[in-house]
Swiss-Prot record:
Pfam families found in the cross-reference section: CheB_methylest (PF01339), Response_reg (PF00072)
Residue ranges occupied by any CheB-type methylesterase domain in the UniProt entry: 164-354
All copies of domain Response regulatory, residue ranges: 5-122
Lineage summary: Bacteria, Pseudomonadati, Thermodesulfobacteriota, Desulfuromonadia, Geobacterales
The gene coding this protein: cheB2
Gene3D superfamilies assigned: 3.40.50.2300, Methylesterase CheB, C-terminal domain (3.40.50.180)
A single GO molecular function term of this UniProt record: protein-glutamine glutaminase activity
Protein name (record): Protein-glutamate methylesterase/protein-glutamine glutaminase 2
Keywords: Chemotaxis, Cytoplasm, Hydrolase, Phosphoprotein
Any one cellular-component term (Gene Ontology): cytoplasm
Enzyme Commission identifier(s): 3.1.1.61, 3.5.1.44
Length: 354
């Protein structure tokens, strides 16, 4: 199998070495070279073109955003932005996604053995997802494998008492690589009084708040990073915070979200499977499930449970996906009622909920 060639661009020698060590631990990935700044990287790329570039957000001589714009406007290559967990770093990382970056990862740092292993899994998975991404030109402006746990580790056993019936529709959405742009298109299409929407987008801790704030500023609906016990109400979308699972719950006729810790599920935290399975349990036929672009199979099993519970389920089609992984797995497992292009999904959801 051909290895994924990666060019690491970061002004910190420590980060470059740490990233190189992490990526070298995966047999599917090869570190082609490292560079301390974009000028060195550009020279290196004249003789060998990488499959994926990891790019620091803030560097001397030329910042990551400027270099990203040059790459995407001339010879697009999948770029994974590597950012520190700061307010400025998060905002810049969101801008990078608009300019064509396909993933954001948090810079590796010291921590517990479990933290380091989860960080390794996330970084290597981000590289693999990026290598599969479909890009477009954008004008300048052997190691231990993390166990693939099911959502059973997060979901408690179902309550035995019957719940009060409700007819309120609720929309649950899962996305990964390419999902930030897909969610923008999706959410911008809704009127201010849309059905409640609950979203899991695979994204590191700290970046989801900036992402939600950016969407809130451009959409007619309200968008916020979810907090534990937030009510699920019309006209608002809740986005799961990075590194926390989010479940849809119900008390009487009131929907709300529960935010909780727990192990990686389907290699992710937050996990789409956790959200979808909770929607199958607590919303049943009143739920609408949407699975969007992304690598892997997170959400595929949960979407099948939703369909079996009577929910309307929609997968984004291959042509409009950046990576046709998660939707394809949901289709293969018989979990989808419809397969639609991205631009048609919101209108279909609105029709179904009206």
């Amino acid at each position: 199998m051909k290895k994924i060639k990666v060019l690491i661009v970061d002004d910190s020698a420590v980060v470059r070495q740490t990233m190189a060590d992490i990526l070298a631990s995966d047999p599917q990935i090869e570190v082609m070279a490292t560079a301390a700044d974009p000028f060195i990287a550009a020279e290196r790329m004249k003789s060998d073109v990488p499959d994926v570039i990891t790019l620091d957000v803030e560097m001397p001589r030329m910042d990551g955003i400027t270099f990203l714009q040059k790459i995407m406007s001339q010879h697009p290559i999948p770029v994974v932005m590597c950012s520190t967990l700061t307010e400025n770093g998060s905002e810049t990382a969101m801008k990078a996604l608009e300019y064509g970056a396909v993933e954001i990862i948090q810079k590796p740092k010291l921590g517990t053995k479990q933290f380091l292993e989860e960080s390794r899994v996330r970084i290597c998975d981000a590289i693999k997802a990026a290598s599969q991404a479909r890009l477009r030109k954008i004008p300048a402006r052997p190691h231990a494998v993390a166990p693939k746990l099911s959502a059973d580790v997060i979901l408690e056993k179902p309550a035995s008492r019957a719940m009060i019936q409700t007819t309120e529709r609720v929309v649950v959405v899962g996305a990964s690589t390419g999902g930030t742009e897909a969610l923008r298109v999706f959410l911008e299409s809704f009127p201010a009084d849309c059905p409640p929407i609950v979203i899991v987008q695979h994204m590191p801790e700290g970046f989801t708040r900036a992402f939600a704030q950016r969407l809130d500023g451009i959409c007619r609906i309200s968008v916020k990073e979810a907090a534990d016990n937030d009510s699920v109400i019309r006209g608002r979308a809740l986005i799961a915070p990075g590194n926390r699972h989010m479940l849809l719950k119900r008390s009487g006729a009131r929907y709300y979200v529960e935010i909780k810790d727990g192990p990686l599920v389907s290699r992710h935290r937050p996990s789409v499977d956790v959200l979808f399975r909770s929607a199958a349990r607590y919303a049943g036929k009143n739920a609408v499930g949407v699975i969007m672009t992304g690598m892997g199979d997170d959400g595929a099993s949960g979407m099948r449970e939703m369909k079996d519970a009577g929910a309307m389920t929609i997968a984004q089609d291959e042509a409009s996906c950046v990576v046709f992984g998660m939707p394809n797995e949901a289709i293969k497992r018989g979990g989808t009622v419809k397969v639609l292009p991205l631009e048609s999904i919101a209108a279909d959801v609105i029709r179904h909920c009206s």
